[in-house]
Amino acid sequence: MLHIDLATAKRLVNEAVTEKGKNYIYPFNACVYAVEADTMYSYVDDDGSLQGDAVTTEDAPACIVGVALYKGGVPLRWLLRNAYKGDAPDILCEAEDFGLLTFDEDVVKWLTCVQIRQDQGVSWGEAVQYANRQESDGYPEI
C-alpha cells in the first residue's frame, strides 16, 4: 500500500510537472481521465461519461493530483470512477477508505494548494511554487 508523506507528494507532483512541462495549464473543463480499453484509451468527462475517440495515454489530460496519484500506483480505473467526485482531500480520503493508500495530514494541505492554483488556470509549475510558499508560511490561505 502506498503511503504518501509530504516528500512523496512533492516527488510525485514534480514527476507530473516534468512529464507535462512546468508551463502546462490544465484545461479545467476538459476531459480528465482515460480508461483503458485493451491498448487504447478513451476520454472520460468530469461526470464519468466516455467521450470522443480512443487516444493514446500521452493525449489523455488529467489534473495534477490525479497524475501524481497514478504515478504513485493508484489504478487508473479507480481514478476514473472516483476522482471526478471531489477535490484533493476528498480523493485522498476515498482512496484511503478503499485501501489504496495512507497519507499524512500535511499532504492534504499541500495538494489542496496545488489543486486550487491549477483550477484557477495557472501553470503546473506556478501551482507547485504557490503550494511551497503556502507551506513555508504555515498555509495562511487554507
Can you annotate each of these PLM segments?
Residues 2-5, 19-26, 39, 45-49, ...:
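Catalytic phosphate/metal-binding cores of nucleic-acid and nucleotide-processing enzymes, i.e., regions
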Residues 30, 35:
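Predominantly extracellular beta-rich ligand-binding scaffolds that present long acidic/polar faces
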Residues 52-54:
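Short, P/G- and charge-enriched loop/turn segments at secondary-structure junctions
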Residues 56-71:
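Active-site nucleophilic cysteine motif
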